[in-house]
Amino acid sequence: PLTINSMKYQVAIIGGGPAGYTAAEAAGKAGLSVVLFEKQSLGGVCLNEGCIPTKTLLYSAKTYDGARHAAKYAVSVPEVSFDLPKIIARKQKVVRKLVLGVKGKLTAHGVTIVSGEATVTDKNHVECGGETYECENLLLCTGSETFVPAIPGIDKVSYWTHRDALDNKELPASLAIIGGGVIGMEFASFFNSLGVQVTVVEMLDEILGGGMDRELAGMLRAEYAKRGIKFMLSAKVVSVMPDTAEASSLIQVNYETADGPGSVVAERLLMSVGRRPVMKGFGLENLGLERTERGNVFVNGQMQTSVPGVYACGDLTGYSLLAHTAVREAEVAIHSIIGKKDAMSYRAIPGVVYTNPEIAGVGETEESLQKRGVAYRAVKLPMAYSGRFVAENEGVNGVCKLLLGSDDTVLGAHVLGNPASEIITLAGMAIELKLTADGWKKIVFPHPTVGEIFKEAL
């Protein structure tokens, strides 16, 4: 029998990823009583099997790459090698450290953390581990899961998802990646740097479709093609099967293009077609929430669902499957609960792909503006206009592209070149603050920094 928990909480949060733990910390700081339910490990996909572990692996690959090409900077490194099991072990160490950090922060703010699968029975009650918890406000932060489409033959072969690729301690000779989006390209970069023959099969006619500047994405693809990655674009995968050659343990991916059918054979197959919100397994159906056309949970600008006192943040809403979006949504939700005026804005959410070179964008793309018929002008500048970039990127170039509206306000910014991830926030701030080119120019940038490229472009 269920025991009624004497603990009543002002806020109950389902899911301990970036949305959930940010909300818990913010609510705790505001003096609210908070209970957070997490069935696996605090930090969610992002911290345990996404953002952080992939960046850790990519940094090892980038360091190895840098050492191999150190001669460009007049540094001689006689023999360079890497140790994959040690790279994986370091990744696990980094993750453990950060998970403990999240736990420490939550505990410090008085958050009750409950490990286990929670079920929402109604908007004021959550069951977990035979206990019932009562709450005034309910936050759903259940995240997303890897989506593997039902490709004919997929059940006959052994394939990797991003999670398997993160923990794999033996390098395959060859790797086929289905999906040339962010996850696909980051793993393509990692394995290519370590000497694996990589082929990317992408259904669209360009990699990184949806959110990234098409022209810059094409330039990144050209750079990786030079490094040996093969790209099959506008290629719809029709089936996968064990390779038919005798005594072969390889996997064959069959696809169709406008020019006819084709196939690629590789030792390993990585599925990175995308992610979808987690809607099942926690009693969502007991709440009767309004859904969007795409079937996601509908929320307003304060992250409130159609049921008063119930909020949804992060990947579950399906707006933007990014950790930093989830963090901001969580802040907005807690502000709504404590009565602080705030609203979610999606105008300036940066997107980054941590390849080498990095590519990043924020705000509008040329494609999104053209589609809506908005007048704009594009300003493009080679990254070589930044002295710091030239000093640190021998024999490499990149590009910075700014999109300005008819009144000269900054609408979008896109960068190909390191460290795009670190400088894109400058452009995000300009967009969020609705700065014009003139207004942005008045800000003094330290010299020499790569971020000055924006000022040069204006």
Indicate residue ranges for each PLM-predicted region.
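Flexible, glycine-rich terminal cap/loop adjacent to redox cofactors
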Residues: 12-16, 22-40, 45, 52, ...
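A Rossmann-like FAD-binding core segment of flavoenzymes
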Residues: 112-115, 119-127, 195-301, 371, ...
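Glycine-rich flavin
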Residues: 8-9, 25-32, 37-173, 199, ...
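Beta1/beta-strand and adjacent pyrophosphate-binding region of the FAD-binding site
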Residues: 7-19, 171-181
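Short hydrophobic core segments
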Residues: 12-14, 118, 133-143, 178, ...
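Glycine-rich dinucleotide-binding loop and its adjacent helix/turn
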Residues: 51, 142-197, 201, 230-231, ...
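FAD-site-proximal beta/loop scaffold in flavoenzymes
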Residues: 155-171, 263-338
